[in-house]
Design a protein with these regions (language model features):
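Extracellular/periplasmic helix-loop-helix junction of adjacent transmembrane segments
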Residues: 20-48
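Helix-loop-helix hairpin linking two adjacent transmembrane segments in secondary transporters
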Residues: 84, 88, 125-171
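Juxtamembrane intracellular "pre-TM" segments in multi-pass secondary transporters
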Residues: 176-206
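Residue-level signature of mid-helix packing/kink "hotspots" within the transmembrane helices
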Residues: 15, 43-51, 135-136
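Cytoplasmic helix-loop-helix junction between adjacent transmembrane helices
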Residues: 92-131
Length: 234
């Protein structure tokens, strides 16, 4: 249950607040392009954070980086809810992404630490179910919150959700990295990243996946304005 909640941080923080785009644009007296920056910056934070948390978790264990990440997500969600300006909101979204990707990365690492091949496959399938349901349910719940309480309510709910997740991690999730496993130096991760960047086959697959995802998220970023403002979907 805890790992499922942690793995849902990324999808929730993307799809949950999409229905609030038009209201946010009105609140900050700006256009849709500037509001969409809050989504682009979030993806930038996710990209950077995933490169960082893996090596740190291999060096220092899973629990402490996870608590730090969830704490960052909680604080940034609170800052988003009470952002006095669009620049503040964009900055808070970047920090929110840096914190949120800890749950996405380290929940998988914890499963690998605790389970064998068959057990890992079973748990990963359950985590994928959570990550698949979150983008489906989140926009509906987000739209309901925006209509009832305003766009700030979305980030208040994310603050409460992540605070409960942090408490659950602190009280119910022990360190999973075995003590007898050699701690990997951070320099080793940099060398591995360097080798990947020289691998043409890897770069080809990564570029293909990135282009495909770019098209999907271009639709996601523009769809709230189309459905709400053009078609009048409440």
């Amino acid at each position: 249950l805890i790992l499922g909640a942690l793995s849902a941080f990324g999808p929730l923080a993307i799809d949950f607040y999409l229905p609030g785009f038009p209201a946010m644009a009105q609140a900050f007296a700006t256009d849709e392009k500037h509001i969409q920056l809050t989504l682009a910056v979030y993806f930038l934070g996710l990209s950077i954070g995933q490169l960082v948390y893996g090596p740190i978790a291999d060096r220092f264990g899973r629990r402490v980086p996870l608590l730090v990440g969830v704490g960052l997500f909680t604080a940034a969600s609170f800052a988003c809810a009470f952002a006095p300006s669009l620049d503040w909101l964009i900055g808070a979204r970047f920090v929110q992404a840096l914190g949120g990707c800890a749950g996405m990365v380290l929940s998988r690492a914890i499963v690998s630490d605790k389970c064998d091949g068959v057990g890992s496959a079973k748990v990963f399938s359950q985590l994928m179910l959570v990550m698949g349901l979150a983008p489906i349910l989140a926009p509906m719940l987000g739209g309901l919150l925006v209509n009832l309480y305003g766009w700030q309510a979305i980030f208040i709910v994310l603050t409460c959700f992540s605070a409960l997740a942090a408490l659950a991690v602190a009280l119910g999730l022990p360190e999973s990295l075995p003590a007898n496993v050699p701690r990997q130096p951070l320099s080793g991760a940099l060398r591995q990243y360097g080798r990947l960047l020289k691998d043409r086959e890897y770069l080809g697959h990564a570029l293909t996946g990135g282009i495909a995802m770019a098209g999907m998220f271009a639709y996601i970023a523009g769809s709230p304005f189309v459905f709400i403002q053009l078609y009048g979907v409440p």
